[in-house]
């Protein structure tokens, strides 16, 4: 779900934290991508002309494989070295949000069934998209595909976006890529958004610089996490009636969620806000401060040449993809991964800071030059 309104708050208070650019600007970069988020997007977006998902001859959905294969190739063609992180077991605290999602899926399926005799194709597709969920089998198929493509992946112990951030913090990758803004709660140096679908939708990639965001918001990590919880995250409900502007104002005035809760409880008559009963905000904060992740420094990432024959067996013979296109894709992978090895020029040079010269120094320098001319 992410954090409601956070993107706009950062744009407003820390505009220098934002950059927009194209895929080619990430040449030579290694990026950790939230695989679970990608697969969900592919199942929704990769469709036939009639709006239905891609399927094999046996009727099995293959939209997730098509998206993962071709969009990963586009990244590699642009000199990017992608790796993927898959979700592990969700934290207990996320159970409420997952239950809500399941209820929404059931409601969408029921509505789809109720209107199937009278609805237009567009309406049926809309309701079908609302019911999309990534299955365990689809996750496993995506992992098999990545292995055959020579692209590394990691199974996170818990949340994929937390593991992506951990890899970025450890210096194994340049950035974490996810649509979930709560990825910033794990303090990756950079968060990339729209990475895997920017070209398809003809939109730029957003990069958020964590350090500049904190400087602009004038917050430390824990205060920022408290802001995100107050805005609304996956781990607990928020205080009703508190929108982004009010949340930012309350955090600035009181400094922490603990102080906000205390203020509301001590002043019930002077505020319209009411703290949810047994509100687990402290537990949610702890999940962000100390996420369950595998240590990034212990993870070795290795990009290899694709296993072409096995790739053809899986994608063509088992899943019904075009052999010519799969073989062509494999060649692009080989070429792209070799090209990406060249790296970036800024990886070979360090930036040297130069102090600004004082006006007096400039005058002295000019004076000495004149003396020499004489």
Curated annotation (Swiss-Prot):
Cofactor detail note: Binds 2 magnesium ions per subunit. They probably participate in the reaction catalyzed by the enzyme. May bind an additional third magnesium ion after substrate binding.
InterPro entries associated with the record: 5-3_exonuclease_C_sf, Flap_endonuc, HhH2, PIN-like_dom_sf, XPG-I_dom, XPG/Rad2, XPG_CS, XPG_DNA_repair_N
Binding residues annotated for DNA, in chain numbering: 47, 71, 159, 232, 234
Alphabetized GO MF terms: 5'-3' exonuclease activity; 5'-flap endonuclease activity; DNA binding; magnesium ion binding
Pfam family, one: XPG_N
Post-translational changes noted in the entry: Phosphorylated. Phosphorylation upon DNA damage induces relocalization to the nuclear plasma.
Necessary cofactors: Mg(2+)
GO biological process: base-excision repair; DNA replication, removal of RNA primer
Family: Belongs to the XPG/RAD2 endonuclease family. FEN1 subfamily.
GO cellular component: mitochondrion; nucleolus; nucleoplasm
Region Disordered, annotated ranges: 354-374
Positions that bind Mg(2+) 1: 34, 87, 159, 161
EC supergroup of this enzyme: hydrolase
Subcellular location: Nucleus, Nucleolus; Nucleus, Nucleoplasm; Mitochondrion
Identification of the protein by name: Flap endonuclease 1
CDD domains: H3TH_FEN1-Euk, PIN_FEN1
Keywords: DNA damage, DNA repair, DNA replication, Endonuclease, Exonuclease, Hydrolase, Magnesium, Metal-binding, Mitochondrion, Nuclease, Nucleus, Phosphoprotein
SMART domains: HhH2, XPGI, XPGN
Quaternary structure note: Interacts with PCNA. Three molecules of FEN1 bind to one PCNA trimer with each molecule binding to one PCNA monomer. PCNA stimulates the nuclease activity without altering cleavage specificity.
Binding-site positions, Mg(2+) 2: 180, 182, 234
